[in-house]
Amino acid sequence: MNRGHRHGASSGCLGTMEVKSKFGAEFRRFSLERSKPGKFEEFYGLLQHVHKIPNVDVLVGYADIHGDLLPINNDDNYHKAVSTANPLLRIFIQKKEEADYSAFGTDTLIRKKNMLSNVLRPDNHRKKPHIVISMPQDFRPVSSIIDVDILPETHRRVRLYKYGTEKPLGFYIRDGSSVRVTPHGLEKVPGIFISRLVPGGLAQSTGLLAVNDEVLEVNGIEVSGKSLDQVTDMMIANSRNLIITVRPANQRNNVVRNSRTSGSSSQSTDNSLLGFPQQVEASFEPEDQDSDEDDIIIEDSGEPQQIPKATPAQSLESLTQIELSFESGQNGFSPPQDTSLVPVPGSLDTELESRAPDQKLLEEDGTIITL
C-alpha cells in the first residue's frame, strides 16, 4: 500500500525522479529534481550518505532502457542516466576493490543468471575477475583519418581534436619545393612541409603525421600559392578542429586499396584517375638537419618570436632528388634503387650520387613554424 502510494506520488509529480539504489543487500529509495540533477560529484556524495559509506570508494552503475548496465563516472553519463529514467532510475553500487567490471556492457541486465547475479548476489567463493587497471573516466578521440574513399592512395586527410587543452598541436612547418612529373615535363613548385614533431605533442601522439610530409590542404583550403605566414594563420585559426591533408613522405604506411572494387571499409575504390590529374610527385627531404637557430616559433597566442640566426660557416648547395618509378598494377609513386640527383639551377657544384631507397633529399628554404 505504501509502495503504491509512493509510486503514484512520484508519477504525479513530473519534476521529480525516483531513484532506487542497491549496495550489497541494502536498497535505498530517494527522489531528485529531474530538471536540476546537479553534478556527478554531488550525486556520488549523496549515495555515500544514503548508504552510510562516506569513506568507501565505490563504482556506480545504472540500468538503461535497453537492458544494459552502464557506468556513471562523469557529468555527461550522469545526465544521460537521468534523462533515460522512466520513471525509476535504478542504481547499482559496488566497492571498487570488489567490482566486477565485466558486468558492464550491452545486454547485461537481460543475462540475469550469469552477469547481473554476480552484482546482486556477490559470492566470496566465486572466481575473482581478471585484474583491470582502470576504467576510463573522461575519454575523447584525439585524431582520425577521414575521406579515405575519395582521396588518392598517396594522400592522407587527418583530423586533430584539441578540446581546449593546453597541449600544443606540436609540429613545425616550413616552406620548400617539390617536383611534379607532368605530361609537359618536370615542374618545380613551392610547397609547405612538416619539418619536425614536438615530443609529447598531439601530432606525435597520433602517429598520423611525420617529418617531411607535404601539406596540401588546411580545412579544405588548398595551400598551393599561399605563403608560409598565410598557412600558419589558417592552422592557428582552426587549431581547435584542424583538418589537414598531407602527402606522406613514407608511402609504405598508406592503406592499399583495390583499384576496381571496394572490399571493406579499409579497402576502397581508387579515385585518383577520376578526380585528380594523373601525375607523379616527388618530395624533397632535408639533406642536412634543420637548424634551430633560424626557426620562427609561433605558439597558440599567434605571436612569433624570432630566434637570433647564427652565421653559417659555409653555404651548402641544395640538391634536388627526382625519383621516378612506377609499381605495376598500382597508381602511385615508388622510390627506385638508383636515383640521379639533378642540381638546382644556380648552384655552383654539380654532384651525382646513388642513394638508398629510403633516403630522400629535401630542399631547405624558408623559415620553420610551430603550432
From Swiss-Prot:
Alphabetized UniProt keyword annotations: Cell cycle, Cell division, Cell junction, Cell membrane, Cytoplasm, Membrane, Phosphoprotein, Tight junction
Domain PDZ: 157-250
Residue numbers bearing the Phosphoserine modification: 10-11
Keyword Iron-sulfur belongs to the record: no
Subcellular location: Cytoplasm; Cell membrane; Cell junction, Tight junction
Ranges annotated as biased composition (Polar residues): 326-340
Top-rank taxon: Eukaryota
Region (Disordered): 253-273, 326-371
One record GO biological process: protein-containing complex assembly
Biased composition (Basic and acidic residues): 352-363
InterPro entries reported for this sequence: PAR6_homolog, PB1-like, PB1_dom, PB1_Par6, PDZ, PDZ_sf
Cellular component annotations (GO), alphabetically ordered: apical part of cell; apical plasma membrane; bicellular tight junction; cell cortex; cytosol; nucleus; plasma membrane; protein-containing complex
Comment field on protein domains: The pseudo-CRIB domain together with the PDZ domain is required for the interaction with Rho small GTPases. The PDZ domain mediates the interaction with PALS1.
Role, per record: Adapter protein involved in asymmetrical cell division and cell polarization processes. Probably involved in formation of epithelial tight junctions. Association with PARD3 may prevent the interaction of PARD3 with F11R/JAM1, thereby preventing tight junction assembly. The PARD6-PARD3 complex links GTP-bound Rho small GTPases to atypical protein kinase C proteins.
The name this protein goes by in its record: Partitioning defective 6 homolog beta
